[in-house]
């Protein structure tokens, strides 16, 4: 869709279309709608990012908590959003062997315990084999640094999802 179509959307349609570009956070799309008109993809994403950046720490952590565990319990039960399902499937996380899945699950549990939110990674920009290494590396980061890194991954995911919706190259 083109930016003129985006700018002509009523509130409900905008939230329906863009409500999950930040995982399970339609409130952000609801707030961004009022910033119309947008000049293009960069302008649209700027408003999503500014909303996240303007949140207090508890709100930023809440945004992160809306993300599913990578290769977690939601994956086999079909409880992922359509976007997360596609992203995790394309990354091959559904194809992990039993031992790999167990190790990844252990690391994600350690991560959640340490930081209080799930490990977030823009899978479409990553080598699937690198996800466990990246998780292990980020487990060693100081909490404030990891919060910034995880929010950066949320923004990458948002950019990719917005580009997909607007039919643009990421």
UniProtKB/Swiss-Prot annotation:
Keywords: Decarboxylase, Lyase, Peroxisome, Purine metabolism
Catalytic activity: 5-hydroxy-2-oxo-4-ureido-2,5-dihydro-1H-imidazole-5-carboxylate + H(+) = (S)-allantoin + CO2
Role noted for this protein: Catalyzes the stereoselective decarboxylation of 2-oxo-4-hydroxy-4-carboxy-5-ureidoimidazoline (OHCU) to (S)-allantoin.
Protein name from the UniProt record: 2-oxo-4-hydroxy-4-carboxy-5-ureidoimidazoline decarboxylase
One GO biological process term: allantoin metabolic process
NCBIfam families associated with the record: UHCUDC
PANTHER family: 2-OXO-4-HYDROXY-4-CARBOXY-5-UREIDOIMIDAZOLINE DECARBOXYLASE-RELATED
Major localization class: other
A Gene Ontology term for the protein's cellular component: peroxisome
Binding of substrate, residues: 68, 84-88, 119-123
GO-annotated molecular function: 2-oxo-4-hydroxy-4-carboxy-5-ureidoimidazoline decarboxylase activity
Organism of provenance: Bos taurus
């Amino acid at each position: 869709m083109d930016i003129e179509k985006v700018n002509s959307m009523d509130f409900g349609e905008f939230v329906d279309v863009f409500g999950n570009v930040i995982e399970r956070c339609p409130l952000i799309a609801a707030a961004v709608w009022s910033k119309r008109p947008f000049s293009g993809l960069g302008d649209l994403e700027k408003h999503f990012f500014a909303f996240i950046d303007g949140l207090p720490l508890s709100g930023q952590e809440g945004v992160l908590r809306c993300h599913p565990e990578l290769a977690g319990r939601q994956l086999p039960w079909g409880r992922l959003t359509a976007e997360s399902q596609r992203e995790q499937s394309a990354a091959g996380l559904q194809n992990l062997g039993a031992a790999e899945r167990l190790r990844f699950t252990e690391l994600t549990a350690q991560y959640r315990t340490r930081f209080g939110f799930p490990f977030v990674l823009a899978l479409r920009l990553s080598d699937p084999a690198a996800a466990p290494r990246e998780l292990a590396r980020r487990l060693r980061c100081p909490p404030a640094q990891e919060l910034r890194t995880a929010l950066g991954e949320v923004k990458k995911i948002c950019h990719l999802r917005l580009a997909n919706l607007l039919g643009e190259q990421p």
